[in-house]
Amino acid sequence: MPKLLYLSVSPRAENSYSRQAGARMIAWLERRHGPLTVIDRDLAADPVPHIDGAMARASLMPAADRGPAEHAALALSETLIGELEAADIVLISTPMHNFTVPSALKAWIDHVVRSNRTFRSTPAGKVGLLADRPVLAVVSCGGPFHDGPGSQRDMMTPYLQYVFGSVGITQVEVVRMENMARGEDFVARGFERLNAWTGSLAIRAA
């Protein structure tokens, strides 16, 4: 049975359009691939703490030199990396906050993007140490992305693609549901965009 790691990020619970989209995506994936084992990581209800000094020190220490305190400091990071390693597909449902990922998702990223654990630094740049797999990101945006008044830049899509790529995961697909704060007509268009996007996806679960 394929394993899905589902990262939900919005603090708006049932009022969240990204969470509604995430639920639709899980149903779509199950229609396509059959039953899934879902690793449900709700980063709003159960937030991952930001990196503290103990973890920063432990992560920079050679593995052979770590003692019980360092292993304890890295325990949550190891759990989160293990969930990512176990997943055949990763699904992220998230709003865009101030042009990029919410801090709750950034904290998760900081725990899983770790030197000499999920990537290795070389003179040519970072080399990912994880196996590739599909990452599907559904992003709910309050405003538009186009040239003209009120538009904003998308710095989130290239960031997600780059950060997952740095650990070896290159199959990153992102859909933006735009103008979701502008009324029911725009919300309907956002979900139409989601439906069109899922129809164009070509992914394979293990």
From Swiss-Prot:
Reactions catalysed according to its record: 2 a quinone + NADH + H(+) = 2 a 1,4-benzosemiquinone + NAD(+); N,N-dimethyl-1,4-phenylenediamine + anthranilate + 2 NAD(+) = 2-(4-dimethylaminophenyl)diazenylbenzoate + 2 NADH + 2 H(+)
Matching Gene3D superfamilies: 3.40.50.360
Cofactors named for this entry: FMN
Origin superkingdom: Bacteria
GO molecular function, one term: electron transfer activity
Residues binding FMN: S10, S16, Y17, S18, S140, C141, G142, G143
Cofactor: binding details: Binds 1 FMN per subunit.
Enzyme class: oxidoreductase
Keyword annotations from UniProtKB, A to Z: Flavoprotein, FMN, NAD, Oxidoreductase
Enzyme Commission number: 1.6.5.-, 1.7.1.17
Matching InterPro entries: Flavodoxin_fold, Flavoprotein-like_sf, FMN-dep_NADH:Q_OxRdtase_AzoR1, NADH:quinone_OxRdtase_FMN_depd
Function: Quinone reductase that provides resistance to thiol-specific stress caused by electrophilic quinones.
Sequence similarity: Belongs to the azoreductase type 1 family.
Record's subunit section: Homodimer.
Official protein name in the record: FMN-dependent NADH:quinone oxidoreductase 2
Gene for this chain: azoR2
